[in-house]
Each structure stands twice: as structure tokens, then as C-alpha cells.
Amino acid sequence: MSVEEKKRRLEELKDQNVVLGLAIQRSRLSVKRLKLEYGVLLERLESRIELDPELNCEDPLPTLASFKQELLTKPFRKSKTKRHKVKERDPNMPKRPTNAYLLYCEMNKERIRQNGSLDVTRDLAEGWKNLNEQDRKPYYKLYSEDRERYQMEMEIYNKKISNIDADDDKEENEQKIKNNEEGSSTKVADSKGGEDGSLVSSN
């Protein structure tokens, strides 16, 4: 191989490396985007569970088909009430337990994606729907353990909150007593000043 051919081959390899580098970069960005989208989806599902008590149980979430059916059967009504500001969640509050369906999604999403799925959410819902009770048991067990963890952490959290509230009430009461004492002292001083003034005027 001549020097010119080696140079040409080297340039080709450099170009290929640049193309591969760009492809890898695009793939990484795609993975980040998919992770972000999946995270947002999970947050929406968890928010729905928190808002609807019927979903906060061991039963799976409704499928996309049921959502579509619900949208078709129920007319949309615009709420006339003012939207209330959502109370900010205490960052120290324990994380709510993840139900069995979301655990299944979390543990199987990568496998579904690697199989070339075009709609991971739909395929996860279908996969869960096709599981029998025996196959769902491990996810229910994990949910049960996570729920016990949540209950224990909430007990500790509520005790801390109670102690903080008690300390705040104590400080507030002490401040009120202090203010009352200062007010009483001021009144006594004013009354004495009035008496002294009356004595001077009488003399």
C-alpha cells in the first residue's frame, strides 16, 4: 500500500470516527430524552394515583383503551371554579409506595424498549394485562413491602412534625406571656405617672 493510499485510508477512518461520534452523541441524547419522558410519565401516573383513592390500591391502573373509552363516553365539562394553588409537598415527607403496576413498568421498560417497541407505554399495559395472578404476585409483594416501609417512615415523620408543632406552640405561648407581662408593666407605670401628676397639681 502506497503512502497516498495510507493517507486516504486514514482520512476515511477519521471521517468514519466523526460520523460514529455524532451517532453516539445522538443516541445518548435520545436515551436522556426517553428517560426524561418516562420519568414525567411516572410522575403523572403517581399524581393520578394520589388524586384518585380508588387507584391507590393493589389493582393495576386503567389501560390506554379504557382511558379512550372514558373520554368518548363522558362529555368534557369546563370547570367554573377557580383553580386552587397546589400546596407544596414537604421534601422531607416519605415517598409514597409505588403500586404493583408501576413497579412492573419500572422493572420491564428497558426489556420492552430493547425488543424494538414503538409504544412502550402501550406494550407495558398489554404485558401487565396478560399476566396471571401468579405472575403478578412478586410485584404485589414488592408493593406490600414498600407500603410497610412508607407506613413506618410516616410514623417517624408525623412524630417529628408533632414535636416541631409542639415547640412552635410553646414558643408562641411564651411570647404571648412575655407580651402580656410587658403590657401589664406599661399600664402600671402609666398609672403611677398619673397619680404623681395629680399629687403635684393638688399641691
Curated annotation (Swiss-Prot):
Residues 78-97, 161-203 are annotated as: Disordered. GO terms for molecular function: DNA end binding; heteroduplex DNA loop binding. Its main location: nucleus. It comes from the Eukaryota. CDD domains: HMG-box_NHP10-like. GO terms for cellular component: Ino80 complex; nucleus. The modification N-acetylserine is found at S2. Keywords: Acetylation, DNA-binding, Nucleus, Transcription, Transcription regulation. It holds the Pfam family HMG_box. Residues 94-158 bind DNA. It is found in: Nucleus. InterPro entries: HMG_box_dom (IPR009071), HMG_box_dom_sf (IPR036910), HMGB (IPR050342). Component of the chromatin-remodeling INO80 complex, at least composed of ARP4, ARP5, ARP8, RVB1, RVB2, TAF14, NHP10, IES1, IES3, IES4, IES6, ACT1, IES2, IES5 and INO80. Present with 1750 molecules/cell in log phase SD medium. Probably involved in transcription regulation via its interaction with the INO80 complex, a chromatin remodeling complex. This is Non-histone protein 10. It comes from Saccharomyces cerevisiae (strain ATCC 204508 / S288c).
